[in-house]
Amino acid sequence: MILEKPSWIRHEGLQIFSIDIQTGGLRFATGGGDQKVRIWSMESVHKDNTNNDSKQRLLATLRDHFGSVNCVRWAKHGRYLASGSDDQVILIHERKAGSGTSEFGSGEPPDAENWKVIMTWRGHTADVVDLSWSPDDSTLASGSLDNTIHIWNMNNGICTAVLRGHTSLVKGVTWDPIGSFIASQSDDKTVMIWRTSDWSLAHKTEGHWTKSLGSTFFRRLAWSPCCHFITTTHGFQKPRHSAPVLERGEWAATFDFLGHNAPIVVVKFNNSTFRKNFSSDQDPKAAPVGWANGASKTPTKEQQPYNVIAIGSQDRTITVWTTASARPLFVARHFFSQSVVDLSWSPDGYSLFACSLDGSAANFHFEVKELGHRLSDSEMDEWKRNRYGDVGGRQSNLAESPAQLLLEQASAKQSAGEKVTSIVEQGKAPPKVSAGVPNPGLVVLSLEVPEVSHEDSKKTAGPTADDVKKGNQLSSPVKQREYRRPDGRKRIIPEAVGFASNQDNIPNHSQNHPVNFSSLDQRMNGTKPSYGSNSNSNNCGVKDRTSVTARANITESLVIQKASAGAGNDGRLSIEHTRSMAPSSLTPCSALSIHVINKNGNEDALPVCLEARPVERGAGDMIGVGALSTKETEIKCIKGTKTLWSDRISGKVTVLAGNANFWAVGCEDGFLQVYTRCGVRAMPAMMMGSAAVFIDCDDSWKLLLVTGRGLMYIWNLYDRACILHDSLASLVASPDESSAKDAGTVKVISATFSRCGSPLVALASRHAFLYDMSLKCWLRIADDCFPASNFASSFSFPQGGELGKLQIDIGKFMARKPIWSRVTDDGLQTRAHLENQLASSLALKSAQEYRQCLLSYVRFLAREADESRLREVCESFLGPPMGKVGSASPTDPKNLAWDPDVLGMKKHKLLKEDILPSMASNRKVQRLLNEFMDLLLEYETDVTLIPQPGTEGNGNGNDKVMTS
């Protein structure tokens, strides 16, 4: 035996958590606390350290993780290297042509080999601590501290299943060598056996670990190469710690490996099976087999094959056992100063590598006379075939129809983050934009109004859609979450939050002007806006925008408080205006303009600017009795250098809005003045009872206004009718349903029209509400109620969508909140989150976002094999049987008023091109898939046989039919 402890195998003095040898025996990999994966040369281990060049030892350093690397595992074919980390991410590495690179500023030479990440898998909500490849390398199982095991498909990179059943941290996972089962071990002191055919629980073993003491970093169990035994970790048989062995079939502990003085952390079976050595007169080739010359038909006890297993413990000891002996073959003490955490056998079966938390690794090389003769691969395959039959077809479910294979190909082309193009032709009308008012003393609204007649201006424009600027397509800076573990270690997890935004909170289409998060926290309650103060000096000068409507507000937010029942005011609302006060040293801006592009193609059209400027009058300038000064505001409409019209109103102007049809001016005194396009007062001043806080208008005749008392109005100014009069009081949580700090308080930071024409209100908590005109209530379309969802911060929406921008803002706000419990059921939250997003996109009438949410929801249900919900989705898109559409009885909810379209998209087309291919990603639901494929085909066939209207009863026998 040769024992070696190379000093050059290290991770910058930090712990080494995992070690694994490549199948070909050319390389081995380590993962450590320095957040790196290092690939080393096996050839350098057995060479003289003094003569070996250090450049040949370390082949590559992989720096793609943001947390400690807990596990590294080579695929059976040796091409891929998988790594799992504290950053909750699994990376798949592959070697590429050429040489590698070096870390900037490290001073190290470039890597000898070029290894790149080809797949990044996210889905776990806690540390990934163990990995295991399937026998054919098509699937990878990962165990995590979120109590789950995820199954990943290497063909498409999709998580095909999530195994839930453990009630505590999963710290070990291993794959059956013939691919029929997966075994996992957890801190809940159980071992679970899972079927790979349908990912159901085959058996739950408990009782053998109930007396175990202490805790370990890992519980890395192992499956024997003969497929008959599973050796587990962290057992206890008084007075020693043990490694219980489970036997296949009954899954009961038949015996234990005893002797360690501390909990066992890792066990590792040798990849080969051995047979005892023979003397010269007992040559196995010369030994007779069968009945020839009176030899025994069955091999003798000495000829029986056996397994070799290595065990690592917290007592810093490694033992090597054979199943042919009751005592350990080898015991290694005093090699490490801390716990042994991982083991790996070489492909030839005679070298054992071990790593420890002390940051070192050791190699133990055995001789043939110590372990025995290794059985060849053909002998092992023959032995498995005789015992378990042909195992070649056990790796995956078989496709039951050719259509399943075709849909699987279509499903593989669909990626979870693909950019979905719109099915419907979007409207050409330009979007609305908003801008802030840096100087409350001067409010300017600039529009470019085409020359249209009064009759043309009465017509309602079509739907609008935001144009996303190129500047918004840049990747956002990396943000991070930070918290401390119970042991005191600090954990920092970077997060991608989507596209960068010009603002740090609400998108520019749904906010009056940019609001800084820091300023929101430093606002002065009860401070009324005054002339001459500056709220944002960065907005000086003229802002170029693309819009046909515009608005400008002075007030940044509205604080609404619901008074307690004992206050004697019957629960009326108490309102405060809050505004950010800029330092006095900053120079106030003189104006803010919103320029509008003429969509009719008139390049010579000049912008029209509506300006509100305060006018101070002293007592000497007044006519009449009294010495008090009064404040007035001068309203001017300017086109180029020409003043089109002007007017003066008393008081301070707080909000402005306008489009090609009208202008609206709201004042602090609580009245609203509406002007025609030419400056005529369209109606007397409208008294609102309190100051106007938020204002918005569409591109026709609708005007939205929110007052300081939390009342919302929507008018159709052309018909002189009020469409909506409602209060924001329903958005205020009751004092007994919220925290003591924010009981009965809500801060409104935005109120605007959504693209569907309904009012959209955003709160400082980043919750967004849409008012449904049919339901007569508010719908919460964006919130932070799903922190553990897999899509909480990584959902990919089509660019420019309202829901996507709100979701990005929610992700930024959630990054500031404490992390959720690691035992949260992320699967339940993910499903609820997707269902909520699907309903919200439908309420917003956003076709692109609805289709994207639908695809993600169906993929998730297919991964979970949730047939009941998948059936409900398919039935809703398939509709009632042919011939019953429109003639269903009122008592049949399935056939009642079924609409073949949703948001302008054909339901059958969505079912055929999107839903069914997404379901094909999991063969466990292929029977349900085939059922609806047949129903859809039958439906389409029936449609082609229905006579066209007016062609029946011709009597000539040549009735025409409608073709699809």
Curated annotation (Swiss-Prot):
The keyword Transcription regulation applies. The keyword Coiled coil applies. Keywords: Chromatin regulator, Coiled coil, Nucleus, Repeat, Repressor, Transcription, Transcription regulation, WD repeat. Residues 453-490 are annotated as: Disordered. One of its GO terms (biological process) is DNA-templated transcription. More abundant in apices and young leaf primordia than in fully expanded leaf tissues. Signal peptide: none annotated. Residues 479-490 have a biased composition (Basic and acidic residues). Residues 920-940 form a coiled coil. Its main location: nucleus. Disulfide bonds: none annotated. One of its GO terms (cellular component) is nucleus. It comes from the Eukaryota. InterPro entries: CAF1B_HIR1_beta-prop, HIR1-like, HIRA-like_C, WD40/YVTN_repeat-like_dom_sf, WD40_repeat_CS, WD40_repeat_dom_sf, WD40_rpt. It is found in: Nucleus. WD repeats lie at residues 10-50, 64-103, 123-162, 165-204, 259-331, 335-376, 644-685. Interacts with RS2. Histone chaperone involved in maintining knox genes silencing throughout leaf development. Belongs to the WD repeat HIR1 family. This is Protein HIRA.
